[in-house]
Amino acid sequence: MLRFLSILSLLFISIFNSYTQNASYQVNGNASSTNITDRNGTISCKCFELTPNYFINPSGGVGSVWNKNKIDLNNSFVLDFDVYLGSNDGGADGIAFGLQQSSSSVGVAGNGMGLGTINPSLGVYLDTYQNSDLNDPVGDHISIQKNGDVTHYNSNELAGPMTVSNLED
């Protein structure tokens, strides 16, 4: 696909869980670490921007942020985070929250949402763009996929796609 759109116009992830607050992170591709401050200059969160704003940088990009400390999937764990996808309905493509084995991986940009082709992996995809070739439904949708496969209605799709209201607002 000859689209050079950013994975999303603007994304911030804020991690609040005690397990991850003290974790160290590997930032890859176009991703960067940033602080958000309130009107008084007080830092309100430690955040990550995965891709630059498409309207500021039309070349788009792909980025990933991975916890350097592996999670033992034999034990229960809780992750709590906020996602801001911006307010531009014309942006693309979305974001994936994924579990995979390497802290330096950056998957396919665009319709791969930074996790595409990473195998083995498990991803929750928040998709804001319809890619007809992937059997995407019309409108924003969420799905759970494995092994970096973002095509719907196959054996790697574990749940979804579920159409949801506007994810960008």
State the predicted function of each range.
Residues 1-22:
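Bacterial Sec-dependent N-terminal signal peptides
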Residues 21-169:
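Polar, low-complexity loop segments and adjacent catalytic/binding residues used for recognizing
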